[in-house]
Amino acid sequence: DNTIFKVWSPTATEVKVNIYTKGSDNEDGSAKLGTYTLEKVMENDEWTSLWSVNLSGDWKNYYYTYSITTTDTTHMGSDTTKTYETQDVYSKAVGVNGNRSMIVDLNDTNPDGWDNDQHILLDKSTSSQVYELHIKDFSYDKDSGVSDANRGKYLAFTENGTTLKNEGELSTCIDYLKQLGITTVQLNPFYDFQSIDESKTD
């Protein structure tokens, strides 16, 4: 097992990767496992602006950030450097508030039947009936007909036959969207929301 870290950073003078057990320092068992220096990737004796390191072992489900040292661009002509710690801008998964990237094997996150899923193609884009919604707002109301366990969560989208106040008359959630003739749902937001502190659950 091994994990390869790569960063394209032509202005950097040094790049390191920091490995953590958790997505934030506030979680139980949080610890920094180590810091590893990335090397310049050369091609035909020329630097490609790419940095890389190959760490042996199983790093899956740990978290990481990059420490990137670069010339201080706030002062023109300055040769002083500054180091920034940042998550990976190409992260596939992140910890709390997106501050640390997660080392993840996407094959492990795919639900059963994922490879058999077939995208529904429309004859033309003008055939789409698009509906934008917020994941929590979609089903959070106690009268939505969605089970208490799934209200306001992704799993609410899997419930069929939901009706207002569970009275069996007015369809809600997915069934309501189907009645409207909606073909495409855009989820807003489903990633990191800067104004929301994800460490607070209420």
Language model features with spans:
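Glycan-association/targeting regions that enable binding to alpha-glucans and other polysaccharides
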Residues: 1-61, 73
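Short amphipathic alpha-helices and their capping/turn segments at secondary-structure boundaries
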Residues: 116-123, 171-181
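An acidic- and aromatic-residue-enriched active-site/binding cleft used to recognize and process polar
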Residues: 20-22, 69-71, 190-192
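Conserved, mostly hydrophobic/aromatic
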Residues: 7, 66, 133, 177, ...
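Aromatic-lined carbohydrate-binding/catalytic grooves of carbohydrate-active enzymes
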Residues: 140-159, 180-202
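Beta-sheet entry/capping signal
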Residues: 4-6, 128-130, 183-186
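The feature marks proteins involved in alpha-glucan
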Residues: 1, 45-152, 156
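Short, acidic/polar
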Residues: 160-176
